[in-house]
């Protein structure tokens, strides 16, 4: 008697048929796999504890509001026509008011800047003074003729066309627009110094007491976050304010860096939430590199980018606004950090580069193009970036 089997001949044939195509396909035929890797959702910066958000970004938002109020109410229009208006500007900067916090106490507060804070505060005081003098309020007197005159080499005044035009701006005797310098200086001395110098510091992620309090969890009184979480969140909040000033439609050299930075912040926060501190440290170092390159790229774009060079070729003074912005971003580079935590450029190195652009008649000088190129090459080398595409 034959042994019993549960596999009938037709079933065996069907099984072999199913296997055969994998072994006998036409030469050159492409076989598409039906396997698809699981989709990994993009990271989000949304974290909760017991149904309540554990992310508090209020302080960075207040700092940005104070800075923007100073710029829009006083600096952009440079309409400081009397002592009352001048005192109002200085008081708002130093003490706050009108529902705005003071900006001055936030400037260069990290331990890395303690040596230079006095000099940096002096730079900001000079910018405010330059704004009033550029618009005709010199000494204790305001002169309408100074406010309404066109700027020229060695003479303050406006560049642009009619009064009230958005493109009209005021410059000092060397052609620099202090209002545009101010925005880049704030980017560095407040947003970058807070994010990179104060809060994104290895000492927080390696501190045993902070780790233990975080894992307990021991929450900050009155809030739903731990001290370690809030430290990272504050860095993220100041980055968001910096990112607004770094955005540019014409900046193509670092496409994707904004997404990489956001992902690094979000994944770093997630790593902290899950006690993966070494991974958080890795994201911290990536953020330092990416953010430094973003600031340097924006500086290069404003100093020697297409818009700047096109204006230099046609009507040079129209480029002064772009160059002034670029010098502001150049100033901010002293607050960037290498992956190791060391600065890319020192305070002295940055001031030296800026001084080279102010030599002679400043932006009015016939040698400006060559000096811009020299500064650009230096930044390109330091930050491993390509120079902007020329016309």
Regions found by a protein language model. Name each.
Residues 28-391:
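Mature extracytoplasmic or organellar-lumen-exposed domains after removal of signal/transit peptides
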Residues 19-22:
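C-terminal motif of bacterial Sec signal peptides marking the signal peptidase cleavage site
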Residues 2-11:
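Bacterial N-terminal signal peptides that target proteins for export
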